[in-house]
Amino acid sequence: MPVYNVEAFLEPCVRSIIGQTYRRLEIILVDDGSPDNCPQLCEQWAQKDERIRVLHKENGGLSDARNAGLRAATGEFVLFVDSDDWIAPEMAEKMLDAMVEYKADMVLCQYTEVFPNGKMLRKYDGKRAVRVYGRQEMFKLLLEDLEVTNHVWRRLYKRKLLPENLFPVGKNFEDMYVMAELTEKCETFVSLNDVYYYYRANPDGIMKTKTSKNLNDYLDALEKSHADICRFCPEMPKAMQDSMRRMRGLTATYLWEDVLVVPTLTSEERKQIRERVDKWADMLPEEVPGFNARQRTYYRLFQENDLRAARIWYELWFNQNNWWCHLKKAVKRAVPLLARNAAEDTFS
């Protein structure tokens, strides 16, 4: 478990791990040069529970910390937990049971997203208690990014699948970099319908922070993931091809949108990202599989480089609350002015 600047969340996370119903755990806390009290708190936890080992290292980022934990791990199975999240008490036991019962290489559980206001949202609600997939089915699910996302947490892995330097150091979206490679190593993949992982949504996290590095890292990761899947599935069925095209079309649309609306990007950064996305989108068909009418319209406006119309379309369809607020403010200001001007015309 990588630990960095999570003093407020560390205790509930560690408590959820040491409270697992499956007791034979090796718990590795990797202090990634955290500037707060986390290093001392980790040592205090190690004194309370002999299963806990603490590694202290210079700050190298999430990937570097995860790699350090992997190098230190001695168990047959590996479970990743982020230090601002928490897990259900039965998570390790239930997932290990499924691993053994189905002779699986990887087991996935469902998760709930927890927002700062305390609201919780279950991210996926399947109809079957357990689903067992082969490798090609798993690749298709990764492309759809619904039930099977690219997160490395909420999964139990056989240790032999994971090289010691699995994650790319210095890159964000490291999960997406490695998931296709891990999937290729699996024969059997099990997806449980139960929620065992609680993901704490961070409004200031990497996923929400739109910098030039983050946007380029995201494109790098997605391109590598898709290249890996194409390499592992050279005779890709049409359904998988459509899923990949739809994902690329959605990503192109989202990044075009970021170029339009993110205020922190410089003009040079906007140009660089726009050129990169344009080059990527040129490889897509004019009709992206699975797009609805609103998405098709938005996509075509970008393809035709009509950015002004695209911005209006974005505000009208994808940012309706903000658009409605602006309209109400405009009406509130304009109506009294209109009435006053009409009165002046009447008496003049």
Regions inferred by a protein language model and the residue ranges of each:
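A short, glycine-/small-residue-rich helix N-cap motif at loop->alpha-helix starts
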Residues: 58-64, 70-73, 171-172
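Short aromatic/hydrophobic "clamp" motif used to bind/position activated sugar donors
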Residues: 78
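Short alpha-helix within the catalytic core of nucleotide-sugar-dependent glycosyltransferases
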Residues: 11-15, 39-43, 67, 75, ...
